[in-house]
């Protein structure tokens, strides 16, 4: 017997309880192209390697970052800089895979995006919002062996609704009738799918995964949380207090706002993409143009999270496929450099107001505390409060720590219990 639309909706909602408040969320600021980390986070004023970049004091004693990032600087008591990151890949595609998964490339196993891993870790507490959402494009790294259930929902432009999240106008569109007809079709599809799985003995394979993805999509169609993708009001229905400050950052700033709203509404991970950082020439003119938007987006995000009491529940990290060369090339740009670069991390269990790692006087070499990609990701997972020995099984059935066998979280950056 077919379910009514109301009972089918109830069945879907029963499968997707509201996210528990104890879960922390992750916001990944993804700078596509290989961002010039030295020009963001280094402080070696006067060194020829700094070019035209000048570092300025921040709200955190002893921490200096680019003078074009004053809003981020005002929030540095809540953020930390890792200045001695060493990754392994200087090719865009390979570097993106390493830095979005936290693991070396393995030709036998397609590793999942960090957002997919976070979604998987919180799988018992899924809500009706997608657990992993990517705003403004993506880096091309998918859910890997975890499957599409843990893939990112793409949002091409902040403020736009997800594609196909409203019933087609041919069956009534965004009306009660449209929702009822959509759910009846969903009920029919589910029964056909269940029959197919039973007849082929495929309950545990791709057919079941396909059914899960379809059910998640339908749950979004009927979700009251769907309005959270709009930027005309806040999660609580009130005007957005810092809207104008975010808007200075254009689409990137609005993407940071959307990430805050989505994580507050229950998303496990939101990736905000900001591309075009492959600056082999004329880098300093480009930085003067682009850094104000970056500052508005990230600086306002950190301020907003702190003011709303959400920073302890939200980890923010800046990632890219690699950094850029310390020395400026003859064209006035910087080339690919995975060997020494920096990231910012804030929120969750992170102790802000500090720099980890020491570079030489001209920033060309590491003097203290090198950090591997695995160490960085182990620190991210620890900042989220993941169990220290949390493991995941790959497509070959092999268990391994989320950040790899040799990875160790950076104790200095983490709050003690």
Kindly label every feature range from the protein language model.
Residues 1-417:
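Ligand-binding pockets and gating/stacking loops
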């Amino acid at each position: 017997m077919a379910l009514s639309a109301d009972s089918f909706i109830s069945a879907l909602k029963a499968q997707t309880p509201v996210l528990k408040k104890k879960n922390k969320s992750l916001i990944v600021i993804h700078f596509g192209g290989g961002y010039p980390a030295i020009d963001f986070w280094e402080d070696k004023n006067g060194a020829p390697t700094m070019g035209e970049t000048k570092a300025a004091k921040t709200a955190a004693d002893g921490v200096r970052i680019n003078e074009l990032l004053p809003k981020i600087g005002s929030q540095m008591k809540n953020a930390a800089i890792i200045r001695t990151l060493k990754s392994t890949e200087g090719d865009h595609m390979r570097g993106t895979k390493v830095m979005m998964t936290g693991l070396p490339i393995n030709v036998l196993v397609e590793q999942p995006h960090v957002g997919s891993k976070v979604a998987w870790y919180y799988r018992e507490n899924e809500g009706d919002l997608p657990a992993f959402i990517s705003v403004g494009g993506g880096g091309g790294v998918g859910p890997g062996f975890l499957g599409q259930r843990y893939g990112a929902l793409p949002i091409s432009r902040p403020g736009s609704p997800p594609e196909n999240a409203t019933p087609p106008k041919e069956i009534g569109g965004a009306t009660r009738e449209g929702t009822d007809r959509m759910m009846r079709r969903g009920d029919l599809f589910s029964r056909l799918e269940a029959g197919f799985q039973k007849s082929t003995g495929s309950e545990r394979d791709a057919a079941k995964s396909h059914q899960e993805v379809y059910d998640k999509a339908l749950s979004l169609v009927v979700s009251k949380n769907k309005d959270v993708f709009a930027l005309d009001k806040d999660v609580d229905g009130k005007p957005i207090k810092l809207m104008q400050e975010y808007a200075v950052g254009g689409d990137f700033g609005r993407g940071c706002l959307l990430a805050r709203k989505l994580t507050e509404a229950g998303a496990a991970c939101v990736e905000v993409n900001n591309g075009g950082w492959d600056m082999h020439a004329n880098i300093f003119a480009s930085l003067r143009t682009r850094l104000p938007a970056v500052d508005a987006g990230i600086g306002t995000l950190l301020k907003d999270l702190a003011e709303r009491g959400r920073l302890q529940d939200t980890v923010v990290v800046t990632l890219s496929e690699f950094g850029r060369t310390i020395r400026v090339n003859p064209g006035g740009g910087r080339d690919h450099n995975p060997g020494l670069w920096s990231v910012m991390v804030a929120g969750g269990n992170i102790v802000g107001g500090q720099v980890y790692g020491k570079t030489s006087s001209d920033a060309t070499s590491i003097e203290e505390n090198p950090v591997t990609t695995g160490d960085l990701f182990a620190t991210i997972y620890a900042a989220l409060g993941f169990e220290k020995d949390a493991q995941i099984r790959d497509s070959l059935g092999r268990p391994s720590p989320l950040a790899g066998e040799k990875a160790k979280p950076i104790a200095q950056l983490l709050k003690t219990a």
